[in-house]
Amino acid sequence: MKVKMIMLLFQILAILTLKSDSADVPDGYIQENVALRGRATQSAQLRGEHAGISHASNAIDGNRDSYFYHGSCSHTEGDNPLWRVDLLQVYTITSVTITNRGDCCGERISGARILIGKHLENNGINNPECSTINIMAAGETRTFHCPQPMIGRYVTVYLPKTGTLHLCEVEVNVLFPAPC
């Protein structure tokens, strides 16, 4: 428990040394994508011919390939579709990087909200918002910086309308002290 608290304090200290307009990692720290260690879920699984290549876990496979039919993207649809990663422990998160589907349908992600928190109440939709995805080009990879460091175990991408949500990669960025 003490080690986790010390790590959390180091993360917060590192985050506070960042300039508000800078995406640079401060000296003495490394940025790591902790989503690779997590477990992903989504509100619905695509059915039919492409069901086997649209799993939630495809969005945390470390592959930014944005062509859906290569099998590296998630796909969920319906009323208020959502995708979520359980990071399996609490982290102090500075930003989330998303790769949008590139072979078509880039506009479908517009209006999605990135939520971060420690609770699964209402499928994580009640957790605080890091950012909203207003417009994102097909195949674009973009980092969404939270207005302040956010503490959470669950990162949810939620589309508050009837539609389709494609995510080809989701990276959850955390700062750690660099090894000596």
Curated annotation (Swiss-Prot):
Lineage, highest ranks first: Eukaryota, Metazoa, Chordata, Craniata, Vertebrata
Record-stated family: Belongs to the fucolectin family.
Tissue spec: Parenchymal hepatocytes.
Stored Pfam families: F5_F8_type_C_2 (PF22633)
Chain span(s) of sequence motif Cell attachment site: 101-103
Record-level GO cellular component terms: extracellular space
Source organism (scientific name): Anguilla japonica (Japanese eel)
Keyword ATP-binding belongs to the record: no
Signal sequence annotation: 1-22
Quaternary assembly: Homotrimer.
PANTHER family assigned: FTP DOMAIN-CONTAINING PROTEIN, SI:CH211-215K15.4
GO molecular function, one term: fucose binding
Name this polypeptide is given: Fucolectin-2
Coarse class of the protein's main subcellular location: secreted
